[in-house]
Curated annotation (Swiss-Prot):
Its EC number is 6.3.5.2. The active site is at residues 80, 168, 170. The keyword Lipid metabolism does not apply. It comes from the Bacteria. Gene3D superfamilies: 3.30.300.10, 3.40.50.880, HUPs. Residues 3-194 form the Glutamine amidotransferase type-1 domain. It holds the Pfam family NAD_synthase. This is GMP synthase [glutamine-hydrolyzing]. GO terms for molecular function: ATP binding; GMP synthase activity. ATP binds at residues 222-228. It comes from Elusimicrobium minutum (strain Pei191). SUPFAM superfamilies: Adenine nucleotide alpha hydrolases-like, Class I glutamine amidotransferase-like, GMP synthetase C-terminal dimerisation domain. Homodimer.
């Protein structure tokens, strides 16, 4: 399938460019800014987008693409920093702005014949985020839009198929921004194909059949949306040659195991369940540091999974639910970010086990995985399931983990999820759960004094988990959740609601 290529110069918004294009059923991929010209040509893109970035084009070490990119015989769109690169390369001028533009700006269209701004209102609000600005465009460019402080907000060179905007059409703050990106792909690049869940499914199954052939695949099935979609794709591609492994760590929620067993039965795939609760709780005994808990669980999970996987001696492949943001981050121009928390997966397994990787979701975002799941016929109980951390309930019990506290938290967490489902707020929230706090509070039940633990309810709205806002649940829903937990769950006598956003907080407490 044809694609639009996006060269990443370090913008925090680069992934949004891809998301906006894909929402318009336009397939695109993100590559590092320094990708070789020959590699780009080999992909035969319909067009190229130069992303924004935090650098100054004149700064020491500023990211620059392969020089031959500027003469590529394909349409090119420069966004913010990308526009400045096009300007400087063509003999234009970029200087520091007297007044930096950060935030909203009113854009006025100056050219009614603009292909890039076709169908846009004459005035619209756009999101600016730049300290440098273009103060002279190359001679072949004509100015198509301005703001009160930016005389070159958009410009075009139709003859050489070069287009540029100083604002960010990819962010939701820019009115009709998706239309600008759609115009670039559909009108300027002539992109005609439609990238849909059905086409994704067909292409993925065909690719896996070609890669795997008559081979056998091991898949770690957790019951979450990613691993479930991977298993469903593989079931269609190779059928009985798929071996699924479910490790019951004892740190899972009520219903997780049963849901996974039901999925395996529906898909008619082999499922091996490993009961490892005793092993995990023994290793976690007395451990209170959250990072140590994560590392113990991650290492032990790999150990258990590897031991079980080796029993399938005819397996040559390991399937993983790697998503596109992970791929992008691994090749990012920005380099390694600070590690806030260790991530739990089986990434170390293929090398140890001499297995080849199968990653059918590696070019998909989370919302696309959910759409693919629906196309595959997976139910809402799987496709719309809230994210659940790899270490499970261990990072929702603050302090040491033990079976009585796990049972208490499981009961409270089930009530939270059940009440949200009854009220319809499960669909309006991105993630919701209970946390067992390491404090005891005084209470009164009947005529007796109690001294028991407190629980916290956490419910957030988000798109991808990178940022999140706390969900404004109705008081009656909160009241039902609190009342049921106090009445039905032994060991809890107080319920609080977390109203912190991310940032500054994280979604999980540990």
């Amino acid at each position: 399938m044809k694609q639009i290529l996006i060269l990443d110069f370090g913008s925090q918004y680069t992934q949004l460019i891809a998301r906006r294009l894909r929402e318009e059923q336009i397939y695109c991929e993100i590559l590092p800014f320094n990708t070789k010209y020959e590699d780009i040509i080999a992909l035969d893109p319909a067009g190229v987008i130069l992303s924004g970035g935090p650098s100054s084009v004149y700064g020491a070490g500023a990211p620059k693409p392969d020089p031959k990119i500027f003469s590529i015989d394909k349409p090119v769109l420069g966004i913010c920093y990308g526009m400045q690169l096009l300007a400087v390369n063509g003999g234009g001028k970029v200087t520091a702005c007297k007044k930096r533009e950060y935030g909203f700006a009113e854009v006025k269209i100056k050219a009614s014949t603009s292909k890039l701004l076709k169908g846009m209102p004459k005035k619209f609000t756009a999101w600016m985020s730049h300290g440098d600005g273009v103060h002279a465009m190359p001679k072949n460019f004509k100015v198509t839009a301005t703001t009160s402080t930016s005389p070159f907000s958009a410009a075009e060179d139709d003859k050489n198929k070069r287009y540029a905007v100083q604002f960010h059409p990819e962010v939701v703050h820019t009115a009709h921004g998706s239309k600008i990106l759609k115009n670039f792909a559909r009108v300027i690049c002539g992109y005609k194909e439609k990238w849909t869940p059905a086409s994704i499914m067909t292409a993925s199954i065909a690719a896996m059949k070609k890669q795997i052939g008559k081979g056998h695949v091991i898949c770690g099935l957790s019951g979450g949306v990613d691993s479930s979609v991977v298993a469903a794709l593989l079931a269609k591609a190779i059928g009985k040659n798929l071996y699924c492994i479910y490790v019951d760590t004892g740190l899972l929620r009520t219903g997780d195991r049963e849901r996974t067993e039901g999925l395996a039965k529906k898909l008619k795939v082999n499922l091996k369940i490993v009961d490892a609760e005793k092993l995990f709780l023994t290793k976690l005994a007395g451990v209170t540091d959250p990072e140590k808990k994560r590392k113990i669980i991650g290492a032990l999970f790999i150990e258990v999974f590897e031991k079980e996987a080796k029993k399938f001696k005819d397996a040559q492949f390991l399937a993983q639910g790697t998503l596109y943001p992970d791929v992008i981050e691994s090749m990012s121009v920005k380099g390694p970010s600070d590690v806030i928390k260790s991530h739990h997966n089986v990434g170390g397994l293929p090398e140890k086990m001499n297995l080849k990787l199968v990653e059918p979701l590696r070019f998909l975002f989370k919302d696309e995985v959910r759409a693919l799941g629906r196309e595959l016929g997976l139910g809402s109980e799987i496709v719309d399931i809230h994210p659940f951390p790899g270490p499970g309930l261990a990072v929702r019990i603050l302090g040491a983990v033990n079976k009585p506290d796990l049972d208490t938290l499981r009961a409270a967490d089930f009530i939270v999820r059940e009440e949200l489902y009854k009220s319809g707020w499960d669909k309006k929230s991105w993630q919701a759960f209970a946390v067992l706090l390491p404090i005891k509070t005084v209470g009164v039940m009947g005529d007796e004094r109690t001294y028991e633990k407190a629980a916290c309810v956490r419910c957030v709205n988000s798109v991808d988990g990178m940022t999140a806002d706390w969900t404004k649940l109705p008081y009656d829903v909160l009241q039902k959740i609190s009342g049921r937990i106090i009445s039905e769950v032994r060991g809890i006598n107080k319920v609080v609601y977390d109203i912190t956003s991310k940032p500054p907080s994280t979604i999980e407490w540990e």
